[in-house]
Design a protein with these regions (language model features):
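Hydrophobic alpha-helical segments, chiefly the membrane-spanning helices
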Residues: 1-311
Length: 311
């Protein structure tokens, strides 16, 4: 048991560190290729923050633990919508950007509802996954099309990424090291989490919805809390809910096209909770485009109640 717990701790550490290194290297290469900063921010940096979820879910699906793969995504998204937004609002009331209310939250809601419908038969087929990925391409097109209007925000989000040019050889090294750590760490993490679930008599779905989801989402929580303290909470909530869209449409889309997934432990309650959590955030965001501290407390309480119901 202790060895498996060590696998989980070391695995998540490698995944998080590897994702950071891979993103740094990829951004440096993109800058040397004269790729526009806004495109870097909306693609490489955004995808880099979801790389832990991607690798853990992808490896889980390949190993035949579909509940762990989907549980990680569903749990991470609930974590993002309820705990990250809730705790950030408790730290400081959140002012929400109009584009988040009008585009990001509705798209996250549609993606979550679509996932719920697709899982009614207990499977995510290649066709289902293909539909999700096509939706991601549409979302990216809409995002890049509106990038000129959000240019200042995007520059701020990636501020500092290219201040010190990185040598090409070092960029390549970081990309390779990042990939190795992501793959190796994901394998350790999945092996440890699966073994712990077996030893405790807990389903892989519950482990995915709690330990795995929480572990892969910790960087977003830390970043959002710091952003809230510095008065940049609007960017934090946009990133959290934008990550929800990427997690469902891209991670489950790509993973499902490669290896269809059969769900056993992920229930309609879990998927419905995902939809409800985003609906609550959307409802709160309409009050003067702000989420107050009491609303943050409600979101946090709902998250705690949900996790308690799983245990």
């Amino acid at each position: 048991m202790l060895l498996n717990i060590l696998f989980i701790v070391v695995g998540i550490a490698l995944v998080l560190w590897g994702a950071d290194r891979l993103t740094d290297g990829a951004v440096a290469v993109a800058e040397k290729m004269k790729m526009p900063q806004i495109v870097i921010g909306l693609t490489i940096v955004a995808m880099g923050t979801s790389m832990p979820e991607f690798c853990v879910s992808f490896i889980s699906a390949l190993k035949g633990t579909s509940d762990l793969a989907v549980g990680n995504i569903v749990g991470s998204n609930i974590f993002n919508a309820l705990l990250i937004v809730g705790v950030s609002a408790l730290v400081a009331p959140m002012t929400i950007m109009e584009t988040t209310v009008r585009k990001d939250i509705p798209f996250a809601l549609v993606a979550s509802a679509l996932l719920l419908i697709m899982c009614l038969d207990g499977n995510i087929s290649r066709i289902d996954a293909g539909i999700l990925f096509v939706m991601f391409l549409i979302f990216m097109y809409m995002t890049l099309k509106g990038a000129k209007k959000q240019g200042a925000d995007a520059e701020e989000a990636i501020e500092g990424e290219g201040k010190k040019p990185m040598a090409t050889w070092l960029s390549v090294v970081w990309i390779l090291v990042g990939l190795i750590c992501l793959i190796g760490g994901s394998n350790l993490f999945v092996e440890g989490a699966t073994a712990v679930a077996t030893n405790l008599g807990v389903s892989e779905a519950v482990i995915g919805l709690t330990i795995v989801a929480g572990g892969t989402s910790l960087p977003e929580l830390a970043t959002s809390v710091v952003s809230a303290r510095k008065g940049n909470s609007g960017i934090a909530i946009g990133n959290a809910l934008g990550s929800n869209v990427f997690n469902i449409l891209t991670i489950l889309g790509i993973t499902g096209m490669i290896t269809p997934m059969t769900l056993k432990g992920i229930t309609y309650i879990d998927l419905s909770m995902l939809v409800i959590s985003i609906m609550i955030v959307w409802l709160f965001s309409f009050t003067k485009y702000k989420i107050e501290r009491w609303e943050g407390a409600v979101l946090t309480a709902v998250f705690i109640g949900y996790i308690y119901s799983l245990l």
